[in-house]
Amino acid sequence: LYILTHHEFSESEAIQLWEKIRKRQQEMQQQLNRHVSFRVAMLDYFISSNIFKNPTIIDIHLFERLQFQATYDELTQVFNRRFILYILKKELERAKRHKHDLTIVLFDIDNFKRINDVMGHLTGDKVLKLFTNVVKDNIRIEDSFGRLGGEEFLLVLPETPISKAFPLLERIRDILAEISGEKMFFTFSSGIAGFPQHADEEITLLHSADKALLRAKLEGKNRDYIFYKE
């Protein structure tokens, strides 16, 4: 941001600005009824907000690279851990404010270590990319999907009751079974938790989904479980 605007932002200011730009991106997409890149939304916001007092011309490829590194996981090109957790925090705040449902799904690719050990890391990378591509192709524009690390991923479904997650997970599983083939066949397990049923803080919500995921793994894998209080 400093490179573009010659203005130093604190971490809290930068986060607030990022949220405003993301909101502008969503508004532009709704108005135009098509995808609008984050870069376009950022420039539109900067210009309309008069943040560009002394704008600097920089190489567009450098700008895109910096933007990508701050937001996305390089291998899978979904949101990175920091950004998907930030989105979860903001979506949970919005759900509380407007009294909406919020569902999260914590994914883990089954037997991923064995895939890496037996078939090699290149195949492991292909599995991660295939999985993320299928998920991205089957979620809504308002949903957010990111990689927490390794073979673990988080899906945030705003304004969505838990029951609506199951048809989506079934569709993802069916598509993967159809296209992965015998040489690269793999499955996933998931843990599901929701607001307001299970938690009203992001850490507790994640912990609830993680418990449900562990239960799915222990009871045979390749299945989806909702968190329940014992």
Residue ranges and their predicted role:
Residues 87-119, 135, 146:
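Active-site-proximal structural segments of metal-dependent nucleotidyl cyclase/transferase enzymes
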Residues 84, 88-89, 105, 127-128, ...:
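Heptad-repeat coiled-coil signal-transmission/dimerization helices
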Residues 68-86, 107-120, 129:
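Conserved nucleotide-binding and Mg2+-coordinating catalytic segments in signaling enzymes
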Residues 130-201, 213-215, 226:
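GGDEF/GGEEF active-site signature
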Residues 1-65, 230:
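Regulatory sensory/coupling modules that transmit signals to nucleotide-handling catalytic cores
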Residues 208-230:
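Catalytic/regulatory signature loops of cyclic-dinucleotide turnover enzymes
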Residues 38-75, 82-94, 143-144, 156:
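Signal-transducing coiled-coil linker helices
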